[in-house]
Amino acid sequence: MVTGFVQSLIKLCGLNWTAPDFTTLCRRQKYIDIQISYQKSRDGLHLLVDSTGLKFLGEGEWKRKKHQPEYRRQWRKLHIGIDAETLQIRAVQLTTNNVSDSQVLGDLLDQIPQDEHIDSVYTDGAYDTKRCRQLNTDRNELLRTVNLAKQCFSGRTLWKKWSGYHQRSLVETKMHCIKLLGDKLSARNFDSQVDEIHARMAILNKFTELGQPHTQVVT
């Protein structure tokens, strides 16, 4: 159906092209190099980092609820870093579900150009490791991981206000936008899954580039 629709559009444009079929697209997907465009922040970069899971094998939630868990369910883990100012995705990494968040932070930071200054990195407690602290020190960022000692000293509410931890809600919103494009991966090959994710990230950045709503607190 989709192939016929695309072929009709090509014909209306007066082009002598042939619409590729689904099999051809699937085979060529893993060889496509998708570039994710973005806009730089006016000031220093404040990077918000988080991860989520995407299913690529197994039945839906309704069948699992009615007929007990599906043992063949498999997941990929998506790690992203977004700009707190532009809300565009600046770093993305797809891994297997047995890779911890702290192991991927270095790969995410490496995707940020070395000549671009990173003011701070906002993460959750999963990144509160010695290795992650060293990675942030190497890039001269102000580490914003959960610090239990400071929380106990000042209280959780004051600590969140002082550290700016509430900004992490922005990356949670971006995760929701990603899931709106699909909460599972259609490709089975890992390289194809990476390209599928990069395509989604490129689309989301284009949408974000069109503009964000302006909000104002009403009291």
Residue ranges and their predicted role:
Residues G4-S8, L15-R133, K179, M201, ...:
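Polybasic low-complexity intrinsically disordered regions
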Residues C13-N16, K206-F207:
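Short arginine-rich
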Residues K66, H117, F153-Q167, L180-I197, ...:
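Short, solvent-exposed helix-loop connector elements
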Residues D101-V104, L170, K174, H198:
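Catalytic-loop motifs flanking and including active-site residues across diverse enzymes
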Residues G125-C177:
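Helix-centered, glycine/charged polyanion-binding patches within enzymatic domains
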Residues C177, L181-K184, N205, E209-L210:
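Hydrophobic alpha-helical segments
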Residues A199-T219:
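Charged phosphate-binding loop/patch that engages nucleotide di/tri-phosphates or the phosphate backbone
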